[in-house]
Amino acid sequence: MSIERTNPLIPITAISQRNLNEGAQEARKTGNAQTKAMAGDTSVKLSEAQKKLVQPSNQDINVEKVARLKAAIADGTLTMDSSKIAEALFREAAESITK
């Protein structure tokens, strides 16, 4: 049995990288032309309900409770009932198993 010397492998990453760069440049040119062509044709009208949803609202967050929690954390007086946390975790795990 004889072992013949083989030619070293030439990586093709340099070739594929060049092809990727050329493709990206073409895509940028085409994308810019399409963006310029479409810029004046687009308009959006929001309904009154959508405008209300976009506006920030304090009704979603109990600001007073958040302030109390922040103060308790800062003072170091916040107490946590670990049994309630454990019960909620077990309940949630049981619900996810039965679904």
From Swiss-Prot:
Family: Belongs to the FlgM family.
Record-given protein name: Negative regulator of flagellin synthesis
Organism placement in taxonomy: Bacteria, Pseudomonadati, Pseudomonadota, Gammaproteobacteria, Enterobacterales
Keyword Repressor: yes
Pfam family, one: FlgM
SUPFAM superfamilies: Anti-sigma factor FlgM (SSF101498)
Protein's job: Responsible for the coupling of flagellin expression to flagellar assembly by preventing expression of the flagellin genes when a component of the middle class of proteins is defective. It negatively regulates flagellar genes by inhibiting the activity of FliA by directly binding to FliA.
GO biological processes: bacterial-type flagellum organization; negative regulation of DNA-templated transcription
Tagged with keyword Repressor: yes
Keyword vocabulary terms for this entry: Bacterial flagellum biogenesis, Repressor, Transcription, Transcription regulation
